[in-house]
Amino acid sequence: MWLYYLQVVMDMRVYVEGYGCVLNTADTEIIKNSLKKHGFEVVNNLEEADIAIINTCVVRLETENRMIYRINELKNLGKEVVVAGCLPKALKNKVKGFLHIYPREAHKAGEILKNYVEKHYRMPYIEEDINKTLYKKLDYLKPSLITPLPICEGCIGNCSYCIVKIARGGLISYPREKIVNKAKELINKGAKCLLITAQDTACYGFDIGDNLANLLNELTQIKGEFIMRVGMMHAKNAELILDELIEVYQNEKVGKFLHLPLQSGDDEILKRMKRGYTVDEFKDIVNEFRRKIKNLCFTTDIIVGFPGETEEQFQNTLEVLRELKPDYIHGAKYSQRKGTEAAKMKQIDTKIRKRRSEILDKLRRELSYLNNKKYIGKAMKVLVLDEGKGYTDNFKVVKFEGGEVGEFRKVKITDAKTFGLKGELIL
């Protein structure tokens, strides 16, 4: 069927849907804009499309299964399907017979598809060449009220459970000048919130003699009223630049939001996960942030049921969480991922994982509500996202009446819910 489309790129309509993290969300937009540049019409309605591109996530087994189900669903609807993102890179054999677009090729999506349609030729994937100009992904970002801003690709970790490293590879940081120039462009064209994103923002620059604190400091000097949310950091890398990081966090343009995954509150499990820090080292980072950054919103991730995790080790995790009281906990049952070291370890019964997940969910709700109650009576700066909703300057969701989209307003918090706040405009 592909040959039917020879020489008719200008008439072709492409539907794109994406899944996964903020970094993948950015890639989905990059794919769309690359397609437009190369003459394709991007449509929002699947029924109108000749081709469907699915930008996949593969972080968990159930996510992988959902992706494969959706791919087959699109195929059965009679669409030509292109599989992009982490799934084809990490588990190529699972999606044989489809055209693939890998994470580091998102900005080349239009060129790849055009070549395939017109010549039935798949451009070779030469990662060394792609890595040299990977920063050109930034050229395909367009402004919106909230805009993801990727700063690097890959990471320097080697966590024993993680398939994303297989999909996204080692660290390639974008030049600071390129990021800052793109941020200026986005803000000048109306962006009010930049989501600074990467697999691990804390390792930014380690490969090019730079670091995240330097980047953030330069970004804060951009003129205009805007706020940045710094994405997930690995604790072992954040620790290396901790003092500089906390200093730049005191700038009003840096949201008081810290996403620092703990994963386990037991040192033996952390060692087997290859996380590279101890529980005490993790606590020290969080406590130092809280000591110097007022109203810090601390978010963390926890994996329950990691291979070999005993009941005592699980209880150790709960105890650490009760002590640190994160504002929000992303809890997940351990997922066995092909090609990872942890997949070869002795696995825990799924019923035990499920029970521990339920216990964690109850605790995370309790802690979230406990934290949110502290804000009742406080006046907070809020970015209005849409009618009746906004982000506080530490990225809690607050509901209120009034305000124009894109404005920064003062809101007094009047009530707290488990995962959000209520308030009223005062300025």
UniProtKB/Swiss-Prot annotation:
SMART domains: Elp3. It comes from the Archaea. [4Fe-4S] cluster 1 binds at residues 21, 57, 86. Keywords: 4Fe-4S, Iron, Iron-sulfur, Metal-binding, S-adenosyl-L-methionine, Transferase, tRNA processing. Residues 141-370 form the Radical SAM core domain. It holds the Pfam family Radical_SAM. [4Fe-4S] cluster 2 binds at residues 155, 159, 162. Catalyzes the methylthiolation of N6-threonylcarbamoyladenosine (t(6)A), leading to the formation of 2-methylthio-N6-threonylcarbamoyladenosine (ms(2)t(6)A) at position 37 in tRNAs that read codons beginning with adenine. Belongs to the methylthiotransferase family. CDKAL1 subfamily. This is Probable threonylcarbamoyladenosine tRNA methylthiotransferase. It comes from Methanocaldococcus jannaschii (strain ATCC 43067 / DSM 2661 / JAL-1 / JCM 10045 / NBRC 100440) (Methanococcus jannaschii).
